[in-house]
Amino acid sequence: MKFSIIIPVYNAEKYIDKCLASILGQTFENFECIVIDDGSSDNSNIIINKYTVNDQRFKVIHQENMGVGAARNAGLDIAKGEYIIFIDADDYVTNDFLEKFALKICSTNADIVIYSLTELHTDSIRSIVFEANNTEEIKKNILASVWPSYSWNKCYRKYLFENIRFPVGEIFEDVLIIPEVCLNAGKIVCIADKTYYYNKQ
């Protein structure tokens, strides 16, 4: 089992080191991390290179600034893992992030795993836990917008993106395709453990 982690980066020098360090520290080591530098004009690339030079699992794509949708698509185009994970450059994960996915996938054979998260605000922290009894309940929650259509709080079997790509130049590009991706999935499960730190500061 191999994971492809896709991280779009645009002028994220304040955050990207912590993000990539959290990937480097994973207890489950069979992954590739594809970082897409979306035309950054700050020092993001210098920080990214620190990882790509020292660890072959980290790869970087440089492109002109085309937006997060195009950046995620560029990562999807070269991803070699069986499972796809999107992480935003200003977020980070726990060191057992991938290990929990691997265990859940092995025990359930799920096409999508939805994970719970911790929201980081300037003056507060909020826990968001996703739980459901079955796949149909999860799909209803996503299609009815009861649950958010984030791309980054899910692990996807790669085949779900064979014929689907993110729209380019659109705001809230996740909302435009993630419900369809989830609808096409066979089995969807949740992890109650909060393994993702979502920076809303």
Which sequence ranges carry the predicted segments?
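Cell-envelope/extracellular polymer assembly enzymes that use nucleotide-activated donors
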Residues: 1-4, 22, 32, 176
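Acidic helix N-cap motif at the loop->helix transition within catalytic regions
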Residues: 15-17, 42-50, 62, 74, ...
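Donor-binding/catalytic cores of nucleotide-activated saccharide
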Residues: 68, 89-191, 198-200
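Short beta-strand/loop segment that forms part of the nucleotide-sugar
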Residues: 7, 30-39, 59-64, 89
